[in-house]
Amino acid sequence: MTTPPIRQDLFGLSTVPFLTPPLKPFLDEDRQTCLDALSAFTHYRGFAALSGRPGCGKTALVHYFTQSLHPPSHKIMYLACGDFSGHDLLRAICCQLELEPVRSSSKTLAAIEQRLKDLGALTPILVLDEMQNASNASLELLRLLAASRFDSTRRLCMIMIGTDSFLGKLALAINESLRQRITYFHRLSPLDEAATATYLTHCLNQAGAHHQLIPPEAVKLIHDLSGGALRLINTLALAALAAASREQVPAVTLEHLHQVRTHVLLPKTQFTL
């Protein structure tokens, strides 16, 4: 029998932490504020833009939010935006609404509007992720979708998620009309050192830990190396636990982090193109 990379019995864990988001979300003041605002925003069916540096947990936070909604009263649609043409984006939205797209963008828009109207009291929530990749043509079609008043009633709730470069796109004059229709902006911040410690403890407790597995000096190094980005915090903590497990040590040390940092982070070297 092969030994698992992380021995749960060694650390007193019921599951392996940091592989997936914990069942109970980590909510510091910034993230709780965002969740509360999204709840109010969804009630009035508007457009929201959530931004932040890569790895700060934007998508996970919106996922927690949508999972908290009641399926009978909400229809959740999720799209990760690549370098779509405008019509490709409309086709993807049609698929989410179980519509057959047509060649004409104007007719496709009209069909989407009618389908949204037919949903009646059901609140459609369209989550558009990776919006920093969206073309100006795609943003223009979203503007057209937002511009329709559907008989003076807002029928679509849209949450757009992207890195800070997405805000740069919205700031362009060509996208001013769409920008003005966004009723809620929020930039998710990376964690400070204290929040990093709280986050690590939260994830470990959710995995069944009842004692300190990552001491303060290791927490500080994890924060310094990750810059407070949750994705990197997870990567470093998971790798450090695996290193401790290999040595059959029941807690992470600074040495474990120094062992793994060169393998899980981009090496600082001079690149030539």
What are the residue ranges of the model-derived segments?
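Short regulatory helix/loop adjacent to the ATP-binding pocket of P-loop NTPases
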Residues: 66, 166-181
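Walker A/P-loop nucleotide-binding motif
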Residues: 44-64
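Conserved small helical "lid"/interfacial subdomain of P-loop NTPases
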Residues: 188-215
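C-terminal alpha-helical "lid" subdomain
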Residues: 2-6, 12-13, 177, 205-273
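Conserved AAA+ ATPase "SRH/arginine-finger" region at the nucleotide-binding site
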Residues: 79-82, 170, 183-196
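Conserved NTP-binding/hydrolysis module of P-loop NTPases
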Residues: 14-18, 74, 84-103
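A short, basic N-terminal segment
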Residues: 1-44, 262, 266-273
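Conserved Walker B catalytic segment
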Residues: 47, 120-160, 172-173
